[in-house]
Amino acid sequence: MSLNMFWFLPTHGDGHYLGTEAGSRPVDHGYLQQIAQTADRLGFTGVLIPTGRSCEDAWLVAASMIPVTQRLKFLVALRPSVTSPTVAARQAATLDRLSNGRALFNLVTGSDPQELAGDGVFLDHTERYEASSEFTQVWRRLLQGETVDFNGKHIHVRGAKLFFPAIQQPYPPLYFGGSSDVAQDLAAEQVDLYLTWGEPPAQVKEKIEQVRAKAAARGRKIRFGIRLHVIVRETNEEAWRAADRLIAHLDDDTIAKAQAAFARTDSVGQHRMAALHNGKRDQLEISPNLWAGVGLVRGGAGTALVGDGPTVAARINEYAALGIDSFVLSGYPHLEEAYNVGELLFPHLDVAIPEIPQPQPLHQQGEAVANEFIPRKAAQS
């Protein structure tokens, strides 16, 4: 099975070390463009663009990278409860059309009550997933060309429609990750690819089996992906030294503050990540070549595969054997580590190198009449 390898645009900051200004670098448009073009040339399928109050806006960043890349896809966040599903459907179709079918979407429900409150969202965990389910139903139906009336608990629309369809049909692929039962139910019902963070293989296997069974019970099949950091070097010893250097400037106070912030979230996945190390830095190799040091201060994905190319490739293939076909990777600094992955890891994997998409002809149509309907063809005399 050929593997889809994704990289990451660090719109929330980048550098040589975690938890310190030492070794950091400005993340401006030119730097993000460098990373995107490098990923494009090396053969990555796409890039994940993160979302949240600590990040640059993912949609604007993705749009700005379209003209400077050729085949790279953009995995961009959809934010239920923050954005209307009808507006999000128009945005998604436009991004897909402007990128010639290179748009992918990642459903993000949110987990930090403080951040959500700052965005005007005051739903609890279960309510957010209810709202996300309703959002996704409306979003998918619009992109499939329906005129939508929907009267849900959280979302109400009447006569919603999309004038400009996406290139990818029936709609651009929808990714999603979540570890709670309600999250897995949403994945089984509505998404195309279920993402998990990089837990040890036995735990990942259990989650995949749960989601696969739930999808099958609904008459659906679903793909799987995993989100991991990587530290790849020419030798295993060099890779582990690089891992140690990454957290060399971390002090106990910074770790404690980060763990306290993670503890206030209602994300089951985040709590599972934190439990891998319990905020302690003395036993961070939690599974062969799987290192939890990143999660001491970074929310979300908190583990890295560490080693030389053949070793990391072997670990990736262990995950692939569980049914995972997409790997969303990152590493510090993201420009240099992209080259390390492309040059030291890719030769040991069966990587699905994307082709440059051919331009897709768009439907010819005149300006909408009264913003209400597409004009008819002229009558033949």
Curated annotation (Swiss-Prot):
InterPro entries per the UniProt record, alphabetical: Alkanesulphonate_mOase_FMN-dep, Luciferase-like_dom, Luciferase-like_sf, SsuD_RutA_monooxygenase
The UniProt entry's GO biological process terms, in alphabetical order, are: alkanesulfonate catabolic process
**Any GO MF annotation of the entry:** alkanesulfonate monooxygenase activity
What does the record give as the reaction this protein catalyses? an alkanesulfonate + FMNH2 + O2 = an aldehyde + FMN + sulfite + H2O + 2 H(+)
EC class (word): oxidoreductase
Keywords of the record, alphabetical order, are: Flavoprotein, FMN, Monooxygenase, Oxidoreductase
Q: What is its EC number?
A: 1.14.14.5
- What other facts are recorded? FMNH(2) which is absolutely required for this enzymatic reaction, is provided by SsuE.
Per the entry, what this protein does is:
Catalyzes the desulfonation of aliphatic sulfonates.
- Assembly notes: Homotetramer.
The family annotation for this protein states: Belongs to the SsuD family.
Q: Which NCBIfam families does UniProt cross-reference here? A: alk_sulf_monoox (TIGR03565), PRK00719.1 (NF001939)
| Protein name per the record | Alkanesulfonate monooxygenase
Q: Specify the species.
A: Citrobacter koseri (strain ATCC BAA-895 / CDC 4225-83 / SGSC4696)
State the organism's lineage: Bacteria, Pseudomonadati, Pseudomonadota, Gammaproteobacteria, Enterobacterales
